[in-house]
Amino acid sequence: MDHPRPHRVGEQLQKEISALLLKGLKDPRVGFVTITAVSVTPDMHLARVYYTVYGEEEQRKETQKGLESATPFFRRELGRRLRMRYVPDLVFEFDKALEYGNRIESLLRQLNEDKPSDD
């Protein structure tokens, strides 16, 4: 059964966290971060926040540390901005979907280049 409320809450959390990243967070470890999705459990106690970041592996690790250390800040600000009885616990996870998509695109491009032409 699909629960519409966690989906709506996830969308709202995505908007609010993105806004907080732009205007409120002052951690230098958190650079060019994009929140790609937020998945909220049906009981509304856990939200997985998926993000991408511009940079190499070292930048990703620093961003992860920065986001984890800012989790109390995010929860406090979300509690002020949203009318919810309980603000979900936030778990930040790097979104590998973009890398996966780029890899598939690269493989398809290689296949097209290696394909002999039928002229």
From Swiss-Prot:
Q: Where this protein primarily resides, as one coarse class? A: cytoplasm
Q: What subcellular locations does the record give?
A: Cytoplasm
Pfam families, A to Z: RBFA
List the GO biological process terms.
maturation of SSU-rRNA
SUPFAM superfamilies, A to Z: Ribosome-binding factor A, RbfA
Q: What keywords were assigned to this record?
A: Cytoplasm, Ribosome biogenesis
Q: Which GO terms describe its cellular component?
A: cytosol
Instruction: Name the InterPro entries on file.
Output: KH_dom-like_a/b, RbfA, RbfA_dom_sf, Ribosome-bd_factorA_CS
Q: Name one GO molecular function term.
A: ribosomal small subunit binding
Which domain of life does the protein's organism represent? Answer: Bacteria
Q: Which HAMAP family match?
A: RbfA
Assembly and partners are described as:
Monomer. Binds 30S ribosomal subunits, but not 50S ribosomal subunits or 70S ribosomes.
Q: Which family does it belong to?
A: Belongs to the RbfA family.
The record's function comment reads: One of several proteins that assist in the late maturation steps of the functional core of the 30S ribosomal subunit. Associates with free 30S ribosomal subunits (but not with 30S subunits that are part of 70S ribosomes or polysomes). Required for efficient processing of 16S rRNA. May interact with the 5'-terminal helix region of 16S rRNA.
Q: Which PANTHER family match?
A: RIBOSOME-BINDING FACTOR A, CHLOROPLASTIC-RELATED
Q: What is this protein called?
A: Ribosome-binding factor A
> What gene does this protein come from?
rbfA
